[in-house]
C-alpha cells in the first residue's frame, strides 16, 4: 500500500472521529475560569468551585445562627456564633464572603481572556456589582458576631444571633428590601439563589455552548509572567497566583 493511500485513509479516519465527536478540542481559557467559579478549583475545600463553596457556607451560617438563637447556654451561643462568623468572613477557610468574591474574580478572569465571548465580557462587570449586597450582609454578620462575643447577657446574645440568622437567610434566598412583594427582585436584594441564576443565564447565552470543564484543564491552568494563562502540559497543578 502506497504512502499516499495511507495518508488518505488516516485523514478519512480523523474526519470520521471529528464528525462522531470522538475528538474534542480543549476548552477555551475563558470557560476554564468560569469552571473555577462553577465546578472545581484545586485550592478550595474538597476542590469545589467557588460558587459551590459560597452556597455551602451560606447554609452553614444560617444553621449555626438559628441554633444559637434558641440556645439558653451563653458559652454555647458564643461558640456557635463564632463558627458562623468564621464561615462568613474567614479568608483562610474560604468563608462566604471570600468565596463569592473569588467566584466573581474568576468570572472577571474569564472576561479578560483573549478568547472570551462578548456575552462573558458583558456579564462579568454586572456580576461583580450583583454580589455587593451579599458581601455587605457578611460584613454585618461579622460586626454582630463581635457583639455576641462581648455580651454577658443570654437574652441579648439570642437576639443578636437571631439578627445574624435573618441576614444569613437573606444571603441564601435574597430579601424584599423595598416591600414590593418580590424577594431578590433587584441586585440590592440578591442572595446566593439570585447570583446562581445570573450565572446560569450567562452560561445559557454562550455560543458555542459552555460545557462542564474537565478537571484536567481546571487544575492545570497556569499564569505566565506576562499575565497570559496557558495549560501546563506537564500537569503539575495550577499556579496558585490568581486562585486564592
Identify the function of each model-found stretch.
Residues 18-21:
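C-terminal motif of bacterial Sec signal peptides marking the signal peptidase cleavage site
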Residues 25-244:
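Mature extracytoplasmic or organellar-lumen-exposed domains after removal of signal/transit peptides
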Residues 6, 23-24:
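Non-globular terminal segments
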Residues 2-11:
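Bacterial N-terminal signal peptides that target proteins for export
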Amino acid at each position: 500500500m502506497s504512502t499516499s493511500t495511507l495518508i488518505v485513509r488516516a485523514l478519512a479516519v480523523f474526519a470520521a472521529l471529528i464528525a462522531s465527536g470522538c475528538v474534542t478540542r480543549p476548552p477555551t481559557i475563558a470557560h476554564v475560569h468560569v469552571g473555577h467559579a462553577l465546578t472545581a478549583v484545586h485550592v478550595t475545600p474538597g476542590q469545589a468551585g467557588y460558587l459551590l463553596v459560597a452556597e455551602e457556607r451560606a447554609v452553614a451560617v444560617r444553621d449555626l445562627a438559628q441554633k444559637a438563637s434558641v440556645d439558653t447556654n451563653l458559652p454555647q451561643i458564643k461558640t456557635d456564633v463564632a463558627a458562623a462568623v468564621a464561615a462568613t468572613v474567614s479568608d483562610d477557610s474560604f468563608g462566604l464572603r471570600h468565596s463569592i468574591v473569588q467566584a466573581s474574580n474568576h468570572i472577571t478572569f474569564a472576561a479578560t481572556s483573549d478568547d472570551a465571548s462578548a456575552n462573558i465580557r458583558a456579564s462579568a462587570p454586572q456580576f461583580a456589582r450583583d454580589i455587593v449586597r451579599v458581601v455587605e450582609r457578611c460584613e454585618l454578620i461579622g460586626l454582630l458576631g463581635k457583639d455576641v462575643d462581648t455580651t454577658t447577657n443570654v437574652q441579648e446574645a439570642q437576639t443578636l444571633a437571631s439578627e445574624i440568622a435573618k441576614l444569613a437567610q437573606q444571603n441564601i434566598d435574597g430579601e424584599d428590601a423595598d416591600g414590593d412583594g418580590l424577594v431578590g427582585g433587584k441586585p440590592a436584594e440578591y442572595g446566593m439563589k439570585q447570583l446562581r441564576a445570573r450565572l446560569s443565564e450567562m452560561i445559557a447565552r454562550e455560543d458555542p455552548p459552555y460545557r462542564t470543564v474537565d478537571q484536567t484543564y481546571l487544575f492545570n491552568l497556569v499564569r505566565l509572567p506576562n499575565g497570559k494563562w496557558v495549560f501546563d502540559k506537564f500537569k503539575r497543578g495550577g499556579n496558585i497566583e490568581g486562585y486564592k
